[in-house]
């Protein structure tokens, strides 16, 4: 979204697993992950930080390198979203609230379509419904 806000002009965009808070509060979300990484090993079982740390242990080779990426994460002002008029698919798992509300994000974009698929933030990426939602939407653009 930051590239779109800075003037990138693709024919269309797909935002998967993203909600309104993740876009307009992106910098805050980045700070949350930095805090989680810096406190690794100390989070009580069952907390969001513990779950995120467990995922990170399985998928990230160098957590400290991720901190540098997260420090560059920026928020996008809500009013900027209203200027992004390209066709956009917002697709998200039915149980995914990780980055806020995907339907609210779709409503904030003037030319967006919302598609709900089964799953949560990480589980929905393994569902064939994600690929099918993107294929169907892209086919409808032609």
Predicted features, each with a name:
Residues 53-76:
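Hydrophobic, aromatic-rich cap/lid helix
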Residues 80-85, 107-109:
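Short, conserved loop/helix-junction motifs that constitute active-site signature segments
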Residues 94-120:
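Conserved loop-alpha-helix segment in the C-terminal half of the alpha/beta-hydrolase fold
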Residues 112-142:
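Catalytic active-site module of serine/aspartate enzymes centered on a nucleophile-bearing elbow/loop
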